Amino acid sequence: DRSVSRGLGDVYKRQPQKLSTIKAALLLPFQEDKRMVEYYEGFLMAVDSLKRTGVSLDLYVYDSGKDISTLNTILAKNEMKSMNIIIGPMHQNQIKPLSDFAEKNDIRLVIPFSQKGEEVFKNPAIYQINTPQSYLYSEVYEHFTRQFPNANVIFIEPSSADKEKAEFISGLKQELKSKGIPMRTVSESATKETLKATLRSDKENIFIPTSGSNVLLIKVLPQLTLLVRENPAEKIHLFGYPEWQTYTRDHLENFFELDVYFYSSFYTNTLFPAAVQFTNAYHKWYSKDLASKYPNYAMLGFDTGFFFLKGLSLYSSELENNLPKMNLTPIQTGFKFQRVNNWGGFINKKVFFIRFTKNFELVKLDFE
């Protein structure tokens, strides 16, 4: 029955029943932010590719504005109660009322942008795509110590401390200490000789700036590059942050020479086959080029739309029990959902490491 929205409450009561038509609603502030339009454009491409494989879908799209009153007007519409899934909102103030509505009506709610919000801890039907930092960090630490079990870590401190990375760095130091991994700290103005004195021949030497800024990179890259050239026998890497994606073009040669790694929960490269295909299709659909910002919102819309709508078409009310089987190759954003507690929803804990190898290869390391 198309009008019955089957949600988490039903999982324990009935056998899964195929949804004859998936009903999905997008609630985003389209007029206010052009990235929301890009997200919608990508989402629409996902809907189209699923329809081509025979999935029956009804998509409802509403401009949610920024006020709770606008949201309430939309939620009062009859059709909203029969949705299988709602994607939105963008604004923080709309999350709680939308979450309450979704929970009351047994509807899955996918929150694509916000990292904050307590609702995911209380509502079992919420999926939070943008991982809260603390969850992301613990995932990065685990991957780091797996990738570099024999590391010698050298932190590079800027002259004025970067508060933004303080939590990440202090957590990483704790993790390294517990694993017995040696570490030391040098300043951004360290000479090549000072840097050389920190190296250990029996270990992988990993330099980690304690700031994600391009300014710090510009300062340390010349000395590190000389260090690598003059010590070819040593294993040396530079490890960094998601925002390095935006500076890659400026430092590409250095990144390859320094065998750079950075972590991110989203990454695409215009040379990856899936990205090439998507970029061409987007151009054909909309007669314009993709925005070059990161993350790319059209790709985010596609990845999110494809994952959840495909999941509902395959598993309907049993989606939550089959999440690990959803093994899709994302264009940009990967998904690895984990329930936050017994009565809460899911957060996305997916993290990639991106590596620029000395052979001029770009590798996306997936840890699952």
Predicted regions and their residues:
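Single conserved hydrophobic/aromatic residue that forms the stacking wall/gate
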Residues: 1-12
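Periplasmic-binding protein-like
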Residues: 26, 81-91, 109-113, 152-158, ...
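Glycine- and acidic-residue-enriched helix-capping/strand-helix junction motifs
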Residues: 32-43, 162-166
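Extracellular/periplasmic periplasmic-binding protein-like sensory domains
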Residues: 221-298
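Extracytoplasmic ligand/sensor domains, especially the bilobed periplasmic-binding protein
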Residues: 87-89, 93-156, 161-169, 247
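Segments of small-molecule ligand-sensing domains
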Residues: 288-295, 306-362
